[in-house]
């Protein structure tokens, strides 16, 4: 296998080899996540959750938003980080409502070759986009599914060079 293929296989099948996932950090307290949900406001996705400090010490939590896109014509990561937000310092027993907002177009993938019928375009493929919030990629809580009923071009670009004439 080529090095790129080996790396893909390692990331897919050796998840336990990652010692410190993104968002890992030392905390002297614990947090619980509840009421995880999402809503649409025009073309804006809003993921929300209540964070409660259930530990004995004050602390802050960084909430991360992830999206799992549908399988489609374009190759995509299995899950992608789309945003994050830090709570204020929460005293033991204190709760904070957190919202992470991002445009729907941020779910789009780039179609370089025209696999979706749209060459050089950012495309939101038809299907179900699973939405999650959590403290790391290993601790995620489902917020719902955004359903795209059709494939949509969010931005059409123009190619500036022909690959056959590209020179180094």
Language-model-derived ranges and their functions:
Residues 53-55, 69-71, 104-106, 135-137:
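Beta-strand elements of well-folded, non-transmembrane domains
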Residues 56-73, 79-81:
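Short acidic, flexible loop segments centered on an aromatic residue
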Residues 73-117:
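Intrinsically disordered, low-complexity Pro/Gly/Ser/Thr-rich segments with frequent PxxP/GP/PP motifs
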Residues 137-145:
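Beta-sandwich strand segments
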Residues 59, 97, 138:
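Short, electropositive, low-hydrophobicity segments enriched in small/polar residues
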Residues 1-60, 66, 92, 121-134, ...:
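Secreted, periplasmic, or luminal enzymes acting at the cell surface/secretory milieu
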């Amino acid at each position: 296998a080529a090095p790129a293929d080996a790396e893909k296989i390692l990331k897919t099948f050796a998840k336990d080899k990652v010692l410190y996932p993104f968002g890992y950090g030392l905390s002297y307290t614990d947090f619980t996540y509840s009421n995880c949900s999402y809503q649409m406001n025009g073309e804006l996705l809003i993921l929300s959750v209540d964070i409660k400090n259930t530990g004995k010490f004050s602390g802050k939590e960084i909430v991360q938003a992830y999206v799992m896109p549908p399988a489609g014509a374009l190759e995509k990561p299995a899950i992608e980080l789309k945003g994050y937000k830090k709570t204020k310092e929460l005293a033991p027993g204190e709760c904070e409502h957190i919202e992470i907002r991002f445009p729907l177009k941020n779910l789009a993938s780039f179609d370089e070759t025209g696999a979706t019928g749209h060459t050089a375009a950012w495309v939101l493929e038809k299907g179900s986009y699973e939405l999650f919030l959590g403290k790391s990629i290993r601790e995620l809580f489902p917020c719902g599914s955004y359903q795209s009923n059709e494939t949509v071009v969010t931005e059409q670009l123009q190619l500036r060079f022909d690959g056959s004439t590209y020179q180094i």
